[in-house]
Curated annotation (Swiss-Prot):
This is Beta-ketoacyl-[acyl-carrier-protein] synthase III. Catalyzes the condensation reaction of fatty acid synthesis by the addition to an acyl acceptor of two carbons from malonyl-ACP. Catalyzes the first condensation reaction which initiates fatty acid synthesis and may therefore play a role in governing the total rate of fatty acid production. Possesses both acetoacetyl-ACP synthase and acetyl transacylase activities. Its substrate specificity determines the biosynthesis of branched-chain and/or straight-chain of fatty acids. The gene is fabH. Belongs to the thiolase-like superfamily. FabH family. InterPro entries: ACP_syn_III_C, ACP_syn_III_N, FabH, Thiolase-like. The keyword Lipid biosynthesis applies. It comes from Ruegeria sp. (strain TM1040).
């Protein structure tokens, strides 16, 4: 028998404020058509004043716990993927732990930008596989609206705020690709490309800074690296592309999503797409898409799912799991 990390609950949270593409036309040389044609994005959510990453993460976690029929007392650990924690420290994960009323277990943040949730899932899987935890909340949450340069039309129209969460539970499997739960992971990074996507602020500058991105260069890396990491994870899981029910990719933009599916030889009707409604929510995008995919009735128990993401670093990776 093999100890597996099985998804037993999913939930998400989106701020109330919805910003349509047309709102940017008043302040930028852009248009709804320009944004849609280049990104597939139609709208995004922005956090309200005083609404923080930890607040949104807590709301998503509560939704995941409710869907699983569990309480915060049942959770052993929280792994939170974010690049926009409320403060430099303590971690946003410990803030969520407090807001959920947890007084035991442990919590920590993972920072791999848009690839963060894949890294967080891999960490949570290791905690469960090794017996260090039986139930782990894995959360992706971001408030990228607070690191946007609102004069840069190439970036500020792309990103949104939100949070998504999964509750993983240890269950015994047969050790085959037919098991439920996380079957394989693949993580990668290459710091030579750190200047392609970064924030020009932080402790060393004593400022928050703004997101800076060489979008065309990131795109050049994205499709090749995402397809490659997905294939590697599938191979480690003992599964083939033909067996995949759903790709749930990082929702960066529709061109990367379409390009990766094509490179993998999979049709778009096997891809969960939410970028049109959420924009790029960085580490929150995959758990958001998983939760929405369940709500839509797309993702069902037993489905074989590939999640893949790439972000600043560059960092990229994939997780294969059976729902």
């Amino acid at each position: 028998m093999t100890r597996r990390a099985v998804v037993i609950g999913a939930g998400h949270y989106l701020p109330d404020r919805i910003v349509e593409n047309a709102e940017f036309e008043a302040t930028l040389d852009t248009s709804d058509e320009w944004i849609r044609s280049r990104s597939g994005i139609e709208r995004r959510h922005f956090a309200a004043e005083g609404e923080t990453t930890s607040h949104m993460a807590t709301r998503a976690a509560e939704a995941a716990l409710k869907s699983a029929g569990r309480s915060a007392d049942d959770v052993d650990a929280i792994v939170l993927a974010t690049s926009t924690a409320d403060l430099t420290f303590p971690s946003a994960a410990t803030m969520v732990q407090s807001q959920l009323g947890m007084t035991k277990g442990f919590a920590f943040d993972v920072q791999a930008v848009c690839a963060g949730f894949v890294y967080a899932l891999s960490n949570a899987n290791a905690l469960i596989a090794s017996g260090q935890a039986d139930r782990v909340l894995v959360i992706g949450a971001e408030t990228f609206s607070r690191i946007m340069d609102w004069t840069d039309r190439s970036t500020c129209v792309l990103f949104g705020d939100g949070a998504g969460a999964l509750l993983l539970e240890a269950q015994e499997g047969e050790g085959t690709s037919k098991d439920r739960g996380i079957l394989a992971t693949d993580l990668n990074s290459d710091g030579r490309y750190k200047d392609l996507l970064y924030v020009d602020g932080g402790v060393s500058t004593q400022s928050t800074g703004y997101l800076r991105m060489q979008g065309n260069q990131v795109f050049r890396h994205a499709v090749e690296k995402l397809a490659s990491t997905a294939h590697t994870a599938l191979e480690r899981a003992g599964a083939s592309t033909d067996e995949v029910d759903w790709i749930v990719p990082h929702q960066a933009n529709i061109r990367i999503i379409q390009g990766t599916a094509k490179k993998m030889g999979l049709p778009m009707d096997k891809v969960v797409v939410t970028v049109q409604d959420h924009g790029n929510t960085s580490a929150a995008s995959i758990p958001l898409a998983l939760s929405v995919g369940v709500e839509r009735g797309q993702i069902k128990p037993g489905d074989l799912i590939v999640t893949e993401a790439i972000g600043g670093g560059l960092a990229w990776g994939a997780v294969v799991l059976r729902w």
